[in-house]
UniProtKB/Swiss-Prot annotation:
InterPro entries: Cystine-knot_cytokine, TGF-b_C, TGF-b_propeptide, TGF-beta, TGF-beta-rel, TGFb2, TGFb_CS. Interacts with the serine proteases, HTRA1 and HTRA3. Interacts with ASPN. Interacts with MFAP5. Belongs to the TGF-beta family. Disulfide bonds join C309-C318, C317-C380, C346-C411, C350-C413. Residues 1-20 form the signal peptide. It comes from Homo sapiens (Human). This is Transforming growth factor beta-2 proprotein. PANTHER family: TGF-BETA FAMILY, TRANSFORMING GROWTH FACTOR BETA-2 PROPROTEIN. The keyword Secreted applies.
Amino acid sequence: MHYCVLSAFLILHLVTVALSLSTCSTLDMDQFMRKRIEAIRGQILSKLKLTSPPEDYPEPEEVPPEVISIYNSTRDLLQEKASRRAAACERERSDEEYYAKEVYKIDMPPFFPSENAIPPTFYRPYFRIVRFDVSAMEKNASNLVKAEFRVFRLQNPKARVPEQRIELYQILKSKDLTSPTQRYIDSKVVKTRAEGEWLSFDVTDAVHEWLHHKDRNLGFKISLHCPCCTFVPSNNYIIPNKSEELEARFAGIDGTSTYTSGDQKTIKSTRKKNSGKTPHLLLMLLPSYRLESQQTNRRKKRALDAAYCFRNVQDNCCLRPLYIDFKRDLGWKWIHEPKGYNANFCAGACPYLWSSDTQHSRVLSLYNTINPEASASPCCVSQDLEPLTILYYIGKTPKIEQLSNMIVKSCKCS
């Protein structure tokens, strides 16, 4: 009796292994590429809530500078975030909203229209104050998905310390003497003498509060970690009783003459170079008509779990390169920027692995044995994805949208 049971189990085991060696489909690269291209066509239209591409209109001779500025800022921000995630081995959140977000850029109002800078006599040595007028977006307060504060750190060759830890605070409206006057948001360690760079902070909660309560919009404060002492970021050492001034300089906030030596010609040249680097907010909003659809038919997506990936085997599951040229591959002329992008796709066989990391695949194979009508073999699917920013026209109106999960970065068997 025991021998029969053991034999039956071994037969079931062998059948299961044989079945699990099959993949979702035979590896036909041309077929995969054609399907991926058509999927991208539908994906873009779906995310924009369009049933068909916008009508072709003559492309504008010149795109307004402010539109290009928003597009460039959004694109650069996404690239920076992707680089940080890669360095920290992090992944894009799997609960990313499906539909495209509209992107709005709000520049910091100039202190002085002619210079957009604070004169040296107006300096606060330990902090800077930055304010934004977001009143135009109040009617869309409930549609806010993300808000980023971006400020360009300038090179300061005269800095007395090579690096500082700067902190961003939301300035609060004090109700009484015991109420807090600021709320911590984030901090960054910056190299004061190094080449300039953009700094980005997630300020979604603060901007959301401003949109709902206008009187609470008192701006942001860029401050030192410990102005009453000297903080050394390299070893987290604090030198007491030694006040430290803010040595980091910011475009659009600090006067050029305080960090630039030379004649007026040099100073004017530096100001011109930094003229497009005003501190600004990038707001990403889900339009109302997309928001309603999102609430009634919310898409649930699989979490990006760690899985076995066959990167170095030609026939097995791995990332395959695919560049999409909007005009050539999709026949579209209505997307102005970019002209195309590296969409990539996942393809290849998923051999069966008897390990603790692939229990999901094992269950699927056993289920397939019991229910052969079901398609339950492990498939090669995308694991890490990144968003894409596009600039397009509907008629003569330019629109900038962020499309989530458009660029495949890695694959897994599932």
